[in-house]
Each structure stands twice: as C-alpha cells, then as structure tokens.
C-alpha cells in the first residue's frame, strides 16, 4: 500500500470534520514512526488505528507547521526550511522566529518593517471553515508574528506544560457543539536536538506524552489524531563537516545577499542548501561532491524537483529555493561555520530523506 504524505492531512481533517462533531489534531513534534512502533503496546496506540505516513521534503517543522495551518503543501507555500531565502530582503531568514537567520532571537524582522503577513500571506484553513477552531501553542510563541498569521480566525490557546495544553484544548472543544482543535507539542523535538534520538529519556517523554493525550478530557466521540512533522537522525558536532572549512574558497562561488555575506546556510545540518552562482554550479557540485564523497550526497536542486521530491513546485517555493543541496549520510552532518552565529552543536537533527527523518505515524483514536 502506498504511504500517504503529510501534504494530504489538511484534506483529511476537513473530511473528518464533515462527518464528526469534533476533531483534534495533536501535532507531536518529532514523533517518528519508529517511536510509534516501539511504543505500540501503549494503551493509546493499542486502541487506535495507526498508519505509516511520510513527511514532506524537507522534513522540517517550518514546512509542516505552515502546511497544517494554511492547508497548502510546501510547493505552494514556499516555507521549505528553518532558514530560507527571502526575496524581498535578499537575505536568509528564519520564518517561524520572524528573524534574520542566525540572529538567535525572535522578532528581529519587525525592526525592518516586515510583518508576519509578509512571510505568511495565506488565508488559514480556519478562515475557510464554518466551524469554530482552536489552536494551542506553548506560551513562548503562542502570539508570535508567525502564529498570529497562521492561526488567524482561530482562537489561540497558550499553555505551559503538555498536560495543561491538552486539557485546555479538550475543554475548549467541549464548550462547542461542533469544533476543530490542534496543539503543537515540541518537548520531544527539543530534547532530541540536544541529547540525541537514542538517549534513554526519549522513551520516557514519548510515554508521558501519550499518557497525557489519553488522559485529556476529550468530549465523548472526539476523533483524536496524533501525528508528527518529521523524525530525528543522530548526529554530533564532532562528525559535522563545515563546507566552508572543507573548501575555504567556497564563499567566492556563492551568491551574496544584501548584507554582503554569502547566502548560507539555508536549510539545516541534514539538508544544507547553498545558493551557488549559476555559472559556478557545475564546478561547485563536482568539487563538493569530491570533498564530501564519504560523508554526503551533493545534489542539484533542479534534479530533485524533476524527481518530484518537493511535489508540485509553485512560484513561492521556486523563488526561495537554493540550487544545490548537501544531504549527509547516516550519522553525518554538514553545515556552515560562522562562529557565534552558525555552528552545529546538536546531537539530533532532521531535514533529510532518511527513514528515521521521514517516516511518521498517523494515529486515529476515538475518545470514549
């Protein structure tokens, strides 16, 4: 049976809402298929329908957060990675933080007059639906420029702990005769970035989160879906190849932005996108391919587009995409070094095409 893509999820949600009074989507960040298999005897999963689905590429939160609120696949919305090129600024930005890439703080784009709607000019699903909708986010970004746009026309709920957020959402749905709600749970993702996906505490977080989902006071008959945006691959700072260290002349072959710096790094350490000068693309692809032969695959982005890896590519994605991507092998990472701004310190990362990063579950559970 063909594996379904996360891009199909918005249509499934709408179909479920037309057949049920209440639907809840638990967006369990980094809850990979392998974790669903490992915890298959948990009461929530044991009593549910569980299917294997696939992330969109790149397998990142920016892609899937935008899809789940806008209803658009990455090929249409164009927010394809944590760091992406923004044409109107001729700079790399971090859309979900509403900042310039590497700033390390949220909201710096507000200082240059860029609003959330400039980056997320889409009508959210909730504006098109005729039933009440709720979106729950951790307090740190519940009312950020990005979430205020993506969640427009929904009631935004801000929470502290996972259990508190689930209870808030469940009670909000209980206050409506008919309604939809979604919640973003980032704890597992955050932990694995810092400690790695194989660290013992990972299983404890998964169990505690599944327990909290099952224990939340969902109204009887609520269809509760649990899915994720991506999985997680093990990496390390010691096994990170910095492309501008491996090849010191590389910056001379890249396009430069409005700040005079190379347009790097777009993407992440598992899918490093480079904006190469068009007339240098063949040379850079060949040379980086040689230098990283034992560490990564170096691919022309146009080849991936032709293979359908991004799905249908529209104007918003096309004008933001780089033209070369480095896809590290298992246990490897590739990034750009600018001390104090761009360094690879994580033990877990995602964005690539490996099964550990791409395979995700879709859990469908009916509350009693």
Model-derived segments and spans:
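Feature captures the catalytic ectodomains and active-site-proximal regions of enzymes
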Residues: 1-368
């Amino acid at each position: 049976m063909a594996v379904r893509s996360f891009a199909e999820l918005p249509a499934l949600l709408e179909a479920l809402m037309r057949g049920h009074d209440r639907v809840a989507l638990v967006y369990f960040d980094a809850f990979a298929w392998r974790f669903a298999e490992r915890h298959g005897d948990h009461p929530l999963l044991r009593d549910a329908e569980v299917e294997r689905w696939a992330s969109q590429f790149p397998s990142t939160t920016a892609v899937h957060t935008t899809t789940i609120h806008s209803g658009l696949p990455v090929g249409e919305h164009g927010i394809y990675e944590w760091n992406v090129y923004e044409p109107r600024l001729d700079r790399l930005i971090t859309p979900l933080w509403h900042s310039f890439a590497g700033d390390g703080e949220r909201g710096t784009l507000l200082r240059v007059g860029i609003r959330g709607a400039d980056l997320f000019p889409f009508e959210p699903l909730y504006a098109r639906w005729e039933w009440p909708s709720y979106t729950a986010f951790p307090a740190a970004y519940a009312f950020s420029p990005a979430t205020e746009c993506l969640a427009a026309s929904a009631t935004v709920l801000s929470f502290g702990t996972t259990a508190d957020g689930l209870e808030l959402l469940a009670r909000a749905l209980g206050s409506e005769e008919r309604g939809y709600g979604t919640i973003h749970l980032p704890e597992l993702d955050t932990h694995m970035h810092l400690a790695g996906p194989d660290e013992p505490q990972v299983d404890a977080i998964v169990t505690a989160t599944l327990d909290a989902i099952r224990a939340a006071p969902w109204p009887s008959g609520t269809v509760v879906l649990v899915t994720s945006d991506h999985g997680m691959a093990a990496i390390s700072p010691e096994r990170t190849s910095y492309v501008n260290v491996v090849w010191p002349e590389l910056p001379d072959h890249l396009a430069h932005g409005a700040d005079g710096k190379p347009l790097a790094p777009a993407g992440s350490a598992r899918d490093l996108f480079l904006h190469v000068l068009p007339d240098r693309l063949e040379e850079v692809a060949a040379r980086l391919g040689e230098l990283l032969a034992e560490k990564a695959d170096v691919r022309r982005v146009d080849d991936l587009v032709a293979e359908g890896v991004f799905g249908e590519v529209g104007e918003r994605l096309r004008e933001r995409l780089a033209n070369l991507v480095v896809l590290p092998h298992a246990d490897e990472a590739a990034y750009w070094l600018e001390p104090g701004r761009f360094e690879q310190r994580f033990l877990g990362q995602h964005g690539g095409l490996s099964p550990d990063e791409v395979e995700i579950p879709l859990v469908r559970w009916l509350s009693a």
